[in-house]
Amino acid sequence: LKGTLMAMAERLMAVRPHPDQINTAANIRAILKDSPMLERYRGHRVQDALSIRCMPQLHGPVKKAVKDAQATLAIELNSSVDNPLIFDEEDGGAVALMGCNADGTYAGMASDNLCIAITDLCKMSNSRIDRLLNSLVSELPAFLNKNADFNNGLMMIQYASAGLQGELRILAHPAVVDNLTTCANQEDYVNMGYNAAKKAYDSMHLAKYILAAE
């Protein structure tokens, strides 16, 4: 892609000190240290396209969303979420407390946020795929194909990735904002956490193929 490390500079990261953004830029600098490609194309462009120079600013929030979801789910997995819950009393008896620890909004919102983060991550990946295959910006053979008279090169991979991105956009719609009244209006609010978790699982599955395509 003939990019530059200018946008990954420590000074740029320091004035917007989100830890995951800083770490992402540091990772990119470390991976590309002493790269002959970087040296060869130094000054090739005034600045890179957003899908290249904004990687820390997108990958950082995605990492944060994953960490936040992990922290939330760790609490959920070590919680008592039944209803009612039975507690011992000091007199040796027990009491049943009716509550709503069974509500799945924590897991649901975490899962919905994951869907959005995954979709954003793959959105940028798809943009880079296009830059790799588009000869007008890559300065490489169209669709990375030297024999255009005989086949379409990697065009079909981009089609597949774009189709998967469309599915991710659908899955990025938050499940927890939906509601249906049930149980004779006793359960007049339903958190839809299961649907959100299922969407997150499906999104991760689709994302693997998009990132592999890139």
What function would you assign to each model-found segment?
Residues T105-E214:
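C-terminal catalytic subdomain
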Residues K2-K123:
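Accessory "access/gating" subregions that flank catalytic or transport cores
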